[in-house]
Amino acid sequence: MKRIFTTNLLLLVFVNILIKPFWIFGIDRTVQNTLGAGEYGIFYTLFNISLLFNILLDFGLTNFNNREISRHPQLLGKYLSNIVGIKVALAIFYGLFTLLFAFTLGYANREIVLLLVLVANQVLSSFILYLRSNLSGLQLFKLDSLLSVLDKTLMIIICGMMLWTKWLPIKFNIGTFVLSQTLSYVLTAVIAFIFVLKNSGKVILKLD
């Protein structure tokens, strides 16, 4: 068990060293230069607003789930049915609270639309972390490690094609950048959900 944990920890470190520096110095820096200080500043401010109430999306559910699935893997289906329903309710509450906060700050129109997408991205990111907690609870550490960088890998591919090639004839701007993140999160969430369902069986949403 100790050997498995060490091996998977090394894998996690390796994939992060491989992907994240390229994201920071390759994509993120190029995005800043392409968008300009003004546009990127709008994105950065709204992104921080979407992060501000991020705790409302989880309230410790992910850690609780990871601990319980590690102890009782046979209850995955039961926990999944209940927690997914709770996560949906928390996502709605978080979204409404964040948008209300933005309105009180005077944001409107374009900024609110952009914030709405960023809020959706935070919801997806939180859901991915929850799904990964099921996989790590089932001792599927390698799969969890790969999923931990899948969204960034997809972002690198999508943004790279828009920034450096003509394969995607789409004008790169703050909107397409945020939507490319949404697409990356959606694909990652779908893949993670498929693997979780393989181990849980049929799921019926509940709020017990």
Question: What label would you give each PLM region?
Answer:
Residues 52, 88, 92-96, 100, ...:
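Alpha-helical transmembrane segments of multi-pass membrane proteins
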Residues 21-26, 44-68, 122-128:
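Small-residue-rich midsections of specific transmembrane alpha-helices
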Residues 125-148:
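Cytoplasmic helix-loop-helix junction between adjacent transmembrane helices
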Residues 27-52, 112, 174-179:
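Interfacial/gating helices of multi-pass transporter permease domains
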Residues 112, 116-119, 146-162, 169-199:
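Hydrophobic alpha-helical transmembrane segments
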Residues 1-23, 77, 81:
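N-terminal membrane topogenesis motif
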Residues 18, 22, 57, 81-108, ...:
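Alpha-helical transmembrane segments of multi-pass membrane transport and lipid-handling proteins
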Residues 2, 31-39, 53-86, 136-142:
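Transmembrane-helix boundary and interhelical linker motifs in polytopic inner-membrane proteins
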